[in-house]
A protein has these predicted regions:
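Metal-dependent phosphodiesterase/nuclease catalytic metal-binding core
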Residues: 3-4, 123, 128-189
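Pre-active-site segment of Zn-dependent metallo-hydrolases
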Residues: 6-65, 69-120, 167-179
C-alpha cells in the first residue's frame, strides 16, 4: 500500500492483504493509518491478493470512492476477492468448530458478500487512458506480470512518480513485455 497525498487529494496505490507468516497476517486486522473519509480513490496495479485483497475491508469500513484499474484486473478481482471472502468464512467456521486459535468466536476479515459488494467501486481503465482524481493525473501502462497488470504513472504537484506494481519478463511467451518507464522523478517498486 502506498499512500499519495497532495494538498487536496489522497489516493492509495494498491490495497493488498498481508500473507504468509502469522505475524504478517495479523497486520490485516490493524486499523490503517489513514482517514478513510478523506481517501479519494484507490489505484490498483493488478489482481493478486497482496495488491487487491484489502479492498473489501476498506469497503466494509465505509470507503465508497472509485477503485481504478484495468478491465482485466477488474474481471480477475471479481473472482479472487469473492473466493478470498469465501475461504476466510470457511476458515473461521473450521477454527470455531475445532476450537483452534485464541478467539472464542473466530471471524473472517471479510466475507464473500462484502467482497462482491466492493466490486461496485471498480472502474475500468484502459492502458494509456489519462484519468484525473482531484489534482492528481495518472495512467496505466502494461507491466507484463499477469493479465491486466499495470504500472501506474502519476503526475502531481509538478512531479512524475512511477509505481511499478509487479513487473513481468521481457521474454515471456504468453504475456506482452512490460513497457519501459518514462522519465520519472521517483520510482516506487
Amino acid at each position: 500500500k502506498f499512500l499519495l497525498k497532495t494538498e487536496t487529494t489522497t489516493v492509495l496505490v494498491d490495497c493488498g492483504l498481508f500473507q504468509g507468516y502469522k505475524w504478517l497476517r495479523e497486520r490485516n486486522w490493524q486499523t490503517l493509518p489513514l482517514d478513510i473519509d478523506k481517501l479519494d480513490a484507490v489505484l490498483l496495479t493488478h489482481a493478486h491478493l497482496d495488491h487487491s485483497g484489502y479492498i473489501p475491508v476498506l469497503y466494509e469500513r465505509g470507503f465508497r470512492g472509485p477503485v481504478f484499474t484495468h478491465h482485466a484486473t477488474k474481471a480477475l478481482c471479481q473472482i479472487l476477492l469473492a473466493d478470498s471472502g469465501h475461504i476466510q468464512e470457511e476458515d473461521a467456521k473450521y477454527y470455531s468448530k475445532h476450537k483452534l486459535g485464541k478467539h472464542a468466536h473466530p471471524e473472517p476479515l471479510y466475507d464473500r458478500q462484502t467482497a462482491e459488494a466492493s466490486m461496485r467501486l471498480f472502474q475500468s481503465v484502459e492502458f494509456d487512458e489519462q484519468i484525473e482524481v482531484g489534482d492528481i493525473r495518472f495512467y496505466l501502462q502494461p507491466a507484463g506480470h499477469i493479465l491486466g497488470a499495470a504500472s501506474i504513472i502519476v503526475e502531481a504537484e509538478g512531479k512524475r512518480i512511477g509505481f511499478s506494481g509487479d513487473v513481468g519478463r521481457f521474454d515471456d511467451v504468453l504475456m506482452k513485455p512490460p513497457r519501459p518507464f518514462p522519465e520519472l522523478d521517483l520510482l516506487l517498486m
